[in-house]
Amino acid sequence: MAKKVPLGIRGQAEETVEHKHTLNHHHDKLPAIYSTPNMIGLMEWAAANAMLPFLDEGEISVGTAINVEHRAPTTIGDLVKTEAVLESHNERFYIFRVTAHNGKAEIGRGTVTRAIVNPAKVAERHAKR
């Protein structure tokens, strides 16, 4: 990674809630509301999008930790928007403050941590195990 990643960079991601994004999709006894795993995934994409301009050829960013609260329900047809803002980093980890909104309320917030890796090097190390 040759480019310095500045604090305050922002990324966004959004999706319209469909049945496949709901608890009910996974279990018919649960309500058809937006699932926490889908919200977290969208928050991760927002953070990944923030990092894209700073990655060198062959690099990707991967999630390494999450600490998120799901605070309000969201129903099918609602648009969920997430934003990630880089709050801190060291040589290895990038910590983003993340929020999710459904147009009516904040539905989630917390932090996600990402690291930059080279998938080819990871595969090479894994093959040696």
Task: Locate each region found by the language model.
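Catalytic strand-loop segment that frames the active site of acyl-thioester-processing enzymes
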Residues: A2-S35
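Conserved N-terminal beta-strand and adjoining loop/helix that marks the start
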Residues: T36-I40
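Intrinsically disordered, low-complexity boundary segments flanking structured domains
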Residues: M1-V5, L52-L55
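Hydrophobic beta-strand-centered segment that forms part of the acyl-chain substrate-binding groove
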Residues: N49-K81
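Generic structural detector for well-ordered beta-strands
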Residues: Q12-E18, E69, T111-T113
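HotDog/MaoC-like acyl-thioester-processing domains
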Residues: T75-I76, V85-R129
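Short, residue-level hotspots on alpha-helical faces of the histone-fold
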Residues: G41-W45, N49
